[in-house]
């Protein structure tokens, strides 16, 4: 009997650290792989895996937050990370997988270190222009780190593959689910979609609630992350979370206002959507979204607006600039070669694993 192929995934803390895993896992399952996931049972990764219904065995470990600054909590978290490494060693030694694939986040560090100690090949994916602290640690233990952006040639274990996204690869017909929304929208107005992400939605939610000029001048779609805001009324659709409707809503939008998370902005690039990036600042993040926004603006894919400057007047100006120069932005996006299909990346990953 042929030896069963096994792979372990890890990554979590935010939806962005799980999305690529959820794209890849069905492909491994389809090809007969046994799939395991190491994460935190209280984290978004467990919620997303559970919600997906995929045939994945989930293993929960202790996890501690990694901080760049002094905190007494660091002392406790050192023990949590150490315990997480021991748990991961026991889990991975029992599974004996062909590889571990990590999408980053604090929870990924123990499984990455454990895999290296057990001589299991470690493949890591980095979405942002600069590495987060977890992936800086993971790089030291990685066999290969795949990157969305070009990295310094001194990082010899990196391999630039571009952004991996399934959004934009297929087109959707108008769904019946959209009919009720369209009935409330004015076809003479531009439709603006606000996407806040799992960590940055509140500012957009509050802004929409406090800015009546928005629904007087635009049709507004707000993916809010907050079910208490769900509503469908004249010129306004607010929903906490979407799956099948995600791309149809993107298709529906003329303009998108988004945070600077790598997954979302590359989805918008794939769909060639006019978009304004309002990145999380350094007070709320490590500055990765600022770097991503600068890169997209420099390449001519998008405009950006800093959060402290967000007002009805500034937003209106930025959206008008996108519309006025729409052809220039769309031409730049059309010329980009920064998108990799999930199938191509899956084949590359499987080949890399097979060659080890």
UniProtKB/Swiss-Prot annotation:
Predominant cellular place of this UniProt entry's protein: membrane
Pathway(s) per entry: Cell wall biogenesis; peptidoglycan biosynthesis
InterPro entries with a match to the protein in the record: GlcNAc_MurG, Glyco_trans_28_C, GlycoTrans_28_N
Class of the enzyme per the UniProt entry, highest EC level: transferase
Keyword Cell cycle: yes
Alphabetical UniProt keywords: Cell cycle, Cell division, Cell membrane, Cell shape, Cell wall biogenesis/degradation, Glycosyltransferase, Membrane, Peptidoglycan synthesis, Transferase
Organism domain of life: Bacteria
Record EC number: 2.4.1.227
Annotated catalysed reactions: Mur2Ac(oyl-L-Ala-gamma-D-Glu-L-Lys-D-Ala-D-Ala)-di-trans,octa-cis-undecaprenyl diphosphate + UDP-N-acetyl-alpha-D-glucosamine = beta-D-GlcNAc-(1->4)-Mur2Ac(oyl-L-Ala-gamma-D-Glu-L-Lys-D-Ala-D-Ala)-di-trans,octa-cis-undecaprenyl diphosphate + UDP + H(+)
Membrane-topology descriptor: Peripheral membrane protein
A single GO molecular function term of this UniProt record: undecaprenyldiphospho-muramoylpentapeptide beta-N-acetylglucosaminyltransferase activity
Binding of UDP-N-acetyl-alpha-D-glucosamine, residues: 198, 289
Gene Ontology cellular component terms for the protein in this record: plasma membrane
Single GO BP term: cell division
Localization annotation: Cell membrane
HAMAP family assigned: MurG (MF_00033)
Function comment: Cell wall formation. Catalyzes the transfer of a GlcNAc subunit on undecaprenyl-pyrophosphoryl-MurNAc-pentapeptide (lipid intermediate I) to form undecaprenyl-pyrophosphoryl-MurNAc-(pentapeptide)GlcNAc (lipid intermediate II).
Family membership: Belongs to the glycosyltransferase 28 family. MurG subfamily.
Official protein name in the record: UDP-N-acetylglucosamine--N-acetylmuramyl-(pentapeptide) pyrophosphoryl-undecaprenol N-acetylglucosamine transferase
Organism: Streptococcus thermophilus (strain ATCC BAA-250 / LMG 18311)
